[in-house]
Amino acid sequence: MSEMQTTRRGRPGYDQQGILAVAVAAFNEHGYDATSIGMLAERLGLSKSAIYHHFGSKDEMLDRALDSALGGLEAVVDAPLPDGAETTDAVARLEHVLRGAVHVLVDQLPAVTLLLRVRGNTDVERRALTRRRAFDRRITALVAEAQTEGSLRSDIDAAVVARLTFGMINSIVEWYRPGGREGADRLADDVVAIALDGLRHP
């Protein structure tokens, strides 16, 4: 999956990455539908044609931002456990995914915020929602596997566990501010403690 990386350069100081960052901030502030190319041009101090040099449409900007957020989350699920991990059972993999997801949210806070506000109003948004649902199913399957192994209590439905856990993780976008008291590592520890300690079999 691609990340929000610069692929073309135009005027100094206004590369693709910089334009996309401003666009995502505007989408989050005003809503995607209410944000026009003209508004972005004014914020950037560029002409509309200069923006179109980098992006063919506003939809392309949205697609790039959502792909960055989703790609980061999908990569966490696909990533192997670190070398030297004590176990590769399902609950260890689930913990690895939860920690990784927290880091993705912190590292890509604006893009993930945008993803969580998608409602399926455009083809781009509908594709993103399809990928997000597929991600949710993978998390549910991992929870169910950990329950089958006996690592997690099984009296709570796996889908409910997945939704509640990621509801907590996703809430980070509403209150987290970079440079605060807790960094990504500490937040990940907190999430794992709250989400898994009450679910583990003694």
Task: Specify the residue positions occupied by each region the protein language model found.
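Hydrophobic alpha-helical segments that form the core
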Residues: 93, 97, 102, 154-174, ...
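Short hydrophobic/aromatic patch on the recognition helix
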Residues: 44-55
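Amphipathic C-terminal alpha-helical segment
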Residues: 103-107, 114, 136, 141, ...
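Hydrophobic alpha-helical connector segments
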Residues: 64, 75-107, 162-165
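Generic detection of well-ordered alpha-helical segments
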Residues: 13, 17, 21, 25, ...
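Amphipathic alpha-helical packing segments from all-alpha helical-bundle domains
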Residues: 71-78, 103, 107, 124-149, ...
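Basic, helix-initiating cap at the start of DNA-binding domains
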Residues: 1-30, 34-43, 59-63, 68, ...
